[in-house]
Amino acid sequence: MRILGIDPGLQTTGFGVVDVDGHRLRYVASGTIRTTGRATGLALGDLPGRLKVLFDGVSEVAARYQPSTAAVEIIFVNVNPQSTLLLGQARGAALTALVNANLPVAEYTALQMKKAVVGHGRAAKSQVQEMVRRLLELPGLPGTDAADALGLAITHAHAGAAMARVGEVAQLTRRQHAMYKAGRSY
């Protein structure tokens, strides 16, 4: 399974792609999508243009790496309501690009991601970077946005493995129930 993690942001959106085979994680790619500056020619005030750059960037990453699923960070309510609204719009552009690519999308809070990757939800960005580097056996630290995106992909891989185990237990329980009803022991 190939998972695309997205850490949405209006100025910089991180992405990370991880392959999962059983319990093995393999790094595929990571990077950032920037919505301002020389590369885009857009100013900070051009919100619609920046959202289009973000949508197109996420669409391009999804087309290039062909993930089977995606994981996106759920935003928190910031002290500044305007910042929260702007981040929500960026997140909406990223989600729309993923859904447009027919990808199932899972959502995780930063706390859930940090707990899954580092072991506790109050981890610093540097701790997330270091654990992502170790888990994916990277030669160097990824940038903070890319590390968060890779962390989301890792979180989803762990959640998928846990759900598969729950499914196996449910299958076993159904089988045991059927055997019990048929009068056989299990």
From Swiss-Prot:
It catalyses: Endonucleolytic cleavage at a junction such as a reciprocal single-stranded crossover between two homologous DNA duplexes (Holliday junction). Binds 2 Mg(2+) ion per subunit. Its main location: cytoplasm. Its EC number is 3.1.21.10. The active site is at D7, E73, D145. Its cofactor is Mg(2+). PROSITE patterns: RUVC. One of its GO terms (molecular function) is crossover junction DNA endonuclease activity. Mg(2+) 1 binds at D7, D145. It holds the Pfam family RuvC. GO terms for cellular component: cytoplasm; Holliday junction resolvase complex. It is found in: Cytoplasm. Keywords: Cytoplasm, DNA damage, DNA recombination, DNA repair, DNA-binding, Endonuclease, Hydrolase, Magnesium, Metal-binding, Nuclease. It comes from the Bacteria. Disulfide bonds: none annotated. Mg(2+) 2 binds at E73. The keyword Iron-sulfur does not apply. GO terms for biological process: DNA recombination; DNA repair. InterPro entries: RNaseH-like_sf, RNaseH_sf, X-over_junc_endoDNase_Mg_BS, X-over_junc_endoDNase_RuvC. Homodimer which binds Holliday junction (HJ) DNA. The HJ becomes 2-fold symmetrical on binding to RuvC with unstacked arms; it has a different conformation from HJ DNA in complex with RuvA. In the full resolvosome a probable DNA-RuvA(4)-RuvB(12)-RuvC(2) complex forms which resolves the HJ. Belongs to the RuvC family. The RuvA-RuvB-RuvC complex processes Holliday junction (HJ) DNA during genetic recombination and DNA repair. Endonuclease that resolves HJ intermediates. Cleaves cruciform DNA by making single-stranded nicks across the HJ at symmetrical positions within the homologous arms, yielding a 5'-phosphate and a 3'-hydroxyl group; requires a central core of homology in the junction. The consensus cleavage sequence is 5'-(A/T)TT(C/G)-3'. Cleavage occurs on the 3'-side of the TT dinucleotide at the point of strand exchange. This is Crossover junction endodeoxyribonuclease RuvC. It comes from Acidovorax ebreus (strain TPSY). The gene is ruvC.
